[in-house]
């Protein structure tokens, strides 16, 4: 009998998975995952890879968030799972990149889309697990909310069921990484220095306090918050990226500069002085060129180390259109004039191009750059198939031998040109590349541009060319433009 009881407890003990913590972050495995997820009402899970640079950058901030929540006595837990070891779990939740964060509420997952610093993580979690705006009873509650994050927004209303209060709460519900507070108490009104109903944004930098003084609408308040939540000049980091690129302001003035440079402080001040004039219209961001991860951004703008420091402006509204200033000296006056000219629409987009190689047409696959693209691809007497690639792209490297063979196959056909262009160093005004490799067909006697969406094989490309761009074709640029216009003009009856 005793042996049976002992065996029962042994089996019971074996069935309970071991749950460990590292810096207050629960270490998840395939064995304990379901138990932990189902045993907590709220748990944020990071799916990571040990070799992932972004995961390494996130780790200390993630641990800080877990520790702070634990010290506050919160029921919200943070966990992490090594997706390279427990692949079946990450596959189940369709993890396609690292780090991927998901909040599990009573076992049901939702995507995390907040910032990567501990304040943003905590603010997002509290917003998702509690009221969209915290009720504030007195001045102490205001101070506590202000201390909880670098940026907070507080609204005072006589009646929290009023139209203005509802608008405030609707905006609060849509901004996950900023804590909001709301109150009807006179003590709160006095603490946030209001004479009547109103909204105030507090931040631990720049001017500290900004009062909303516009007509209250959802769009207006949201834009105002996004414009004022950032510093006059922000540094681009993995932590600030989601706020910078996810905000309402789509025009960004970028200063590429080394923080180790002796002229950094002066340049930052010149940049900051210019930023004051364009608050709410253009974001001013500096990119530290000493950071290895920022090399890809420099490459995107075609910048080399010997060109630094440098200013570039980008519009995210029009397929990430870039603008290059015509000045060399970085001063407040020059930056301001350039930015105003951009807003006035008098600055032409900057299109990158390498010089035309001497041997560009020596091999079966022709080499295109910005400077010879129109001449070759738009030749009305030729059917031209172009691969737009990036040197670092794995899929492009896999395609390379096939593309070379395709060039050889059609080398003697004077009506067909097989070409390629490095899109990290060359741009064409009306050809927008969103991913690599992208393959486009420029048919003879036509202004159409057709995307190739078929198999990336000799057979697939051959059939496409022999059917004059029909077999394996996606929508043409013209058809895509028409579809977009139809979508914009469509209204529900």
From Swiss-Prot:
Keyword Endoplasmic reticulum attached: yes
Catalytic-site annotation from UniProt: 52, 55, 393, 396
Gene Ontology CC terms, in alphabetical order: endoplasmic reticulum; endoplasmic reticulum lumen; procollagen-proline 4-dioxygenase complex
Disordered: annotated span: 467-493
Reaction(s) catalysed by this chain's protein: Catalyzes the rearrangement of -S-S- bonds in proteins
Motif Prevents secretion from ER: positions: 490-493
Keyword Transmembrane: no
Entry similarity comment: Belongs to the protein disulfide isomerase family.
Name of the featured protein: Protein disulfide-isomerase 2
Naturally occurring in which organism (per UniProt): Caenorhabditis elegans
